[in-house]
A protein has these predicted regions:
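Acidic, low-complexity intrinsically disordered segments
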Residues: 2-28, 32, 55-99
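Beta-strand elements of well-folded, non-transmembrane domains
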Residues: 35-54, 69-71
Length: 99
């Protein structure tokens, strides 16, 4: 078992897809998102401000207000254990903004 987990590009993309689906038309979003990855679940609690172009409503920027990310790993006895991970909002931002 690892002491901490690496958040891969595919996990960032999965989080970005979930968040983008909830952002439609909003200027502020707060929620909890989960991505399963084998025997672990990565959770992200997130609050962001969504800046939009005045005329088109296109998302032009995002600002994180607060976030917390952790990984839940099932132990051999079936009990869940919280583990740290290397989540970086800048990488999620890139996935959300298509950069």
């Amino acid at each position: 078992m690892r002491n901490s987990y690496i958040i891969t590009k595919s996990i960032y993309r999965a989080f970005a897809e979930q968040i983008a689906a909830k952002m439609e038309g909003l200027h502020y979003l707060s929620g909890v998102f989960s991505v399963a990855d084998g025997d672990v679940v990565h959770r992200l609690e997130l609050s962001i401000i969504i800046y939009r172009e005045a005329g088109s409503g296109e998302v032009v920027d995002l600002s994180d207000v607060w976030w917390e990310s952790y990984t839940i790993e099932r132990q051999s006895d079936g009990e869940p254990r919280l583990k740290i991970n290397d989540f970086d909002f800048a990488l999620l931002y890139k996935a959300l903004m298509g950069r």
